Amino acid sequence: PSLPGWATKNCLPTLFAENLDIPMSQAGLMSTITIALSSFIGVILGGTLSDKWVQKNIRGRVYTGAIGLGLTIPSLLLLGFGHSFVAVVGAGLLFGIGYGIFDANNMPILCQFVSSKYRATAYGIMNMTGVFAGAFITDLLGKWTDGGNLGLGFAMLAIIVFIALAVQLYFLRPKTDNME
């Protein structure tokens, strides 16, 4: 899921400029505000939902993160193939909410599987892996942009997110909310 996160941070202004035929100065501001505002909303929603759900179901955090990932799938498709202002900006808002919901639950889910003795290391490895993924996807989408296929690249990220969602739901089966 780091791939679409980095893709939006690094390439969404270009996608907005191309798909909406607006200057990059407007596209950069529009994409930054869209993602930042909606991600903040997603973090608040995702954190609140997860904290309540885990009290009733130990997999509540996993399910909350999965809901967030699920929201990013149609938004990536619409970001990639949309050409109207409402479609593209709406998809950006939906992506931000979904990503915020997912992101708010990364550390809480990690706490369900990794002892407090190793959490900083585990989170550091997770972040480092995400940064490497970000470098990879930025380079790849840059090449796709040069070939005129940035939108297709965004849409294809939906496939990767779907696979990550399936893996998360199948394999993440916590036994506690806080591994000691």
Predicted segment positions?
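Multi-pass alpha-helical transporter architecture, strongest
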Residues: 75, 79-81, 155-180
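Interfacial helix-cap and linker-helix signal at transmembrane-aqueous boundaries
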Residues: 16-17, 49-50, 54, 141-149
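Cytoplasmic membrane-interface "Motif A"-like loop-to-helix N-cap segments
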Residues: 51-68
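Hydrophobic core of transmembrane alpha-helices in multi-pass small-molecule transporters
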Residues: 85-101
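A late C-terminal transmembrane helix in Major Facilitator Superfamily
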Residues: 43, 111-147
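A membrane-interface helix-boundary motif in multi-pass transporters
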Residues: 23, 60-63, 140-160
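Conserved glycine-rich helix-kink/hinge and helix-boundary motifs of the Major Facilitator Superfamily
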Residues: 28-29, 66, 120, 124
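Extracytoplasmic gate region of multi-pass secondary transporters
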Residues: 1-44, 103, 107, 138
